[in-house]
């Protein structure tokens, strides 16, 4: 029995070590630009790669306009109308920094931009070095206090066609509608279609073999709710998928934040990736429309550029909220995040919410915990009989196993009963780890006193040391029948090893584990008192 518990504790330690590796990668990412030979590819109709000059886009021109809302500050290049910078006004770059987090940017060393345009026979974005120079009414646009919507129209004329590209931003929203209106006065039919993609330097996504982090592409279609498509995948093979019903999106995601293009009412759109030099594109090419002389056409797509806020993203597009990737334990992590958010809405502090969540989870598991300690106590009571049985039977393992099972059945003892709560707690622990790791709400969220960021490690290691001390107390209070010296050393070393791993874990996760241990000490005391009355435990 105690050997099984030792094995489970070792397994939990291994899980903690793997999570520790993952946290180190997430905390200290080291992306490296990946050089790639220039690539040209052909995609099924509509063939985007054949329509747009594959030369890498030049750095943003000096003709930029600034668009500011309560949550976003955008820089839009009037040449092509690309979004070349996006600052998230309500998210600081670093803790206590006055600078906003830059999601999109176009600098000498790094490019991550959102491009959109019109291609096809009468398209105006067929060459990356000869894109339209739009006219705008001002150099800056700001959402006024009495406004809920801000519209920025940009106009261009060529060959008898009038083009208007409009950016529409709304208060409190990270979703940006991008619309094209084309009026044909050329005297002939005009055929063109819209494209929208994200372009970023190819990077090493980082991570470990066991539990990798992720920075790269992702997409959704009618048949695939959510799938990652890494920079390495892009280099191996260009993606080309048809959105039969027009439902889907293409995204570039990273820790806490994402950018995505969502086509609107465009059945038959083509979702694609391309590699150009050391740049990777992922986006959507909408079907062509033929505009008769004197007629007009309308094209639209939505750009999400912001934090991974699940509720808002789910409203913008189906499955867009799945970029908050909880891994294979999502069915546990998602309800935990929901419950944590509900609690926080009442208590107003994410640290207090974690404490409350811990009490709820451990309270729900109390019947199992009680059964565990009762089973362990009964097993200890059977030790004299088991020892006598070993002396009587000797080395006959088959007979020993048979008589042990008969004894367990007679005494109504489940030898695995003490392991069940530990087995159940491991997936909850892992799911909560991912819930805390993926929750942008915890980023730079303070708790009390010295804890200013629950998503970062404790700067003074106070919580990990308290957690290690609580594990030591639990160990001292727990009776054991372990006689093997090696197992005794392993169990004694466990608090030290866990403390070491947890030194660099997010303080929110360490807080959960510390409070969970405190609850264990309380429950343990109550259960032992009840067992003493039944004669199953002695101090």
Curated annotation (Swiss-Prot):
Q: Which is one GO molecular function term here?
A: membrane insertase activity
Q: Where are the transmembrane segments?
A: 6-26, 341-361, 416-436, 454-474, 495-515
Matches recorded under Gene3D superfamilies = 2.70.98.90
Q: Which GO terms describe its cellular component?
A: plasma membrane
Q: Where in the cell is it found?
A: Cell inner membrane
Q: What GO biological process terms are annotated to this protein in UniProt?
A: protein insertion into membrane; protein transport
What keywords does the record list, in alphabetical order?
Cell inner membrane, Cell membrane, Chaperone, Membrane, Protein transport, Transmembrane, Transmembrane helix, Transport
Q: How does it sit in the membrane?
A: Multi-pass membrane protein
Residue ranges annotated as coiled coil are: none
Family to which the UniProt record says this protein belongs: Belongs to the OXA1/ALB3/YidC family. Type 1 subfamily.
Q: What does this protein do?
A: Required for the insertion and/or proper folding and/or complex formation of integral membrane proteins into the membrane. Involved in integration of membrane proteins that insert both dependently and independently of the Sec translocase complex, as well as at least some lipoproteins. Aids folding of multispanning membrane proteins.
Q: How does it assemble?
A: Interacts with the Sec translocase complex via SecD. Specifically interacts with transmembrane segments of nascent integral membrane proteins during membrane integration.
What this protein is called in its record is Membrane protein insertase YidC
């Amino acid at each position: 029995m105690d050997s099984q518990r030792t094995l489970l504790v070792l397994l939990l330690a291994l899980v903690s070590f793997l999570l520790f590796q993952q946290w180190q990668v997430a905390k200290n990412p080291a992306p490296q630009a990946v050089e790639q030979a220039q690539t040209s590819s052909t995609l099924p109709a509509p063939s985007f790669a054949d329509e747009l000059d594959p030369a890498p886009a030049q750095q943003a021109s000096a003709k930029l306009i600034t668009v500011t809302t309560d949550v976003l500050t955008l820089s839009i290049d009037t040449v092509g109308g690309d979004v070349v910078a996006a600052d998230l006004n309500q998210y600081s770059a670093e803790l206590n920094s006055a600078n906003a987090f830059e999601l999109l940017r176009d600098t000498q060393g790094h490019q991550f931009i959102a491009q959109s345009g019109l291609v096809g026979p009468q398209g105006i974005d067929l060459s990356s070095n000869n894109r339209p120079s739009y006219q705008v009414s001002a150099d800056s646009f700001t959402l006024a206090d009495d406004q809920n919507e801000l519209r920025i129209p940009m106009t261009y004329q060529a060959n008898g066609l009038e083009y208007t590209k409009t950016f529409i931003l709304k208060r409190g929203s990270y979703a940006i509608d991008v619309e094209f209106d084309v009026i044909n006065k050329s005297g002939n039919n005009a055929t063109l279609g819209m494209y929208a993609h994200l372009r970023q330097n190819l990077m090493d996504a980082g991570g470990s073999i066991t539990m990798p982090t992720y920075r790269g592409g992702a997409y959704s279609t009618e048949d695939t709710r959510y799938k990652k498509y890494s920079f390495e995948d892009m280099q191996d093979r260009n993606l080309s998928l048809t959105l039969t019903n027009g439902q889907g999106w293409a995204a570039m995601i990273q820790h806490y934040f994402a950018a995505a293009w969502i086509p609107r009412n465009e059945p038959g759109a083509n979702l694609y990736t391309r590699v150009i030099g050391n740049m990777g594109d992922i986006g959507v090419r909408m079907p062509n429309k033929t505009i008769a002389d004197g007629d007009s056409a309308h094209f639209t797509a939505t750009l999400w550029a912001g934090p991974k806020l699940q509720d808002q993203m789910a409203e913008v597009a189906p499955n867009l909220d799945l970029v908050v990737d909880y891994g294979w334990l999502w069915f546990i992590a998602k309800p935990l995040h929901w419950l944590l958010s509900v609690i926080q809405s009442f208590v107003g502090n994410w640290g207090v919410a974690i404490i409350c969540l811990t009490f709820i989870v451990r309270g729900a598991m109390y019947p199992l915990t009680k059964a565990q300690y009762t089973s362990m106590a009964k097993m200890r009571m059977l030790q004299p009989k088991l020892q006598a049985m070993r002396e009587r039977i000797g080395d006959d393992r088959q007979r020993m196993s048979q008589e042990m099972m008969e004894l367990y059945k007679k005494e109504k003892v489940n030898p695995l009963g003490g392991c069940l709560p530990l087995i159940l707690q491991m997936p909850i622990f892992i799911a909560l780890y991912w819930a805390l790791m993926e929750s942008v709400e915890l980023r730079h969220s303070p708790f009390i006193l010295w804890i200013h960021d629950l998503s970062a490690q404790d700067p003074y290691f106070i919580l990990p040391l308290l957690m290690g001390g609580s594990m030591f107390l639990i160990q001292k209070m727990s009776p054991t029948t372990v006689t093997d010296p090696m197992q005794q050393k392993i169990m004694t070393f466990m608090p030290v090893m866990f403390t070491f791993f947890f030194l660099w874990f997010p303080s929110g996760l360490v807080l959960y584990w510390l409070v969970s241990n405190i609850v264990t000490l309380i429950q343990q005391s109550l259960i032992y008192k009840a067992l003493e009355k039944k004669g199953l435990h002695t101090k």
